Amino acid sequence: MKIGISLPVRELQDDVGAIKAFAQAAEELGLSHLRVPEQIIRPGSGPLHEPLTLMALIAGATEKIELVPSVIMLPARQTVLVAKQAATLDRMSGGRLRLGVGIGRDKVEYDALGMDFHNRGARCEE
């Protein structure tokens, strides 16, 4: 059985030292993976860091723990760029990235991006 943990980004906010320390402690405890949330916006929430960028920071502070973003909203991003970012992070972390993609479920996020919520499935298939 593999057991991981979610990075409490809202609680740790922008404290880079605390984020690194949390990731290192998770690794030292033998947890298999560290999950980083993916949300473009969330009204009333604290910091919502971009997950691939945040995982690059974590990769530099750890050696073994698997890096797992929650499902990346692919239709909200440029697909080739996501592929390049993910491949780079995976290579630079020694193959520790586990990537999942999906279409998202919150219309508020697509509205904030000026994108059509209703054709997100078709955009993801492209």
For each of these PLM feature ranges, what is it?
Residues 37, 70, 100-102:
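Structural motif
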Residues 2-15, 75-126:
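Flexible, glycine-rich active-site loops centered on histidine and acidic residues
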Residues 1-61:
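N-terminal beta1-alpha1-beta2 module of alpha/beta enzyme domains
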Residues 34, 67, 97-99:
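Hydrophobic residues within beta-strands of alpha/beta enzymes
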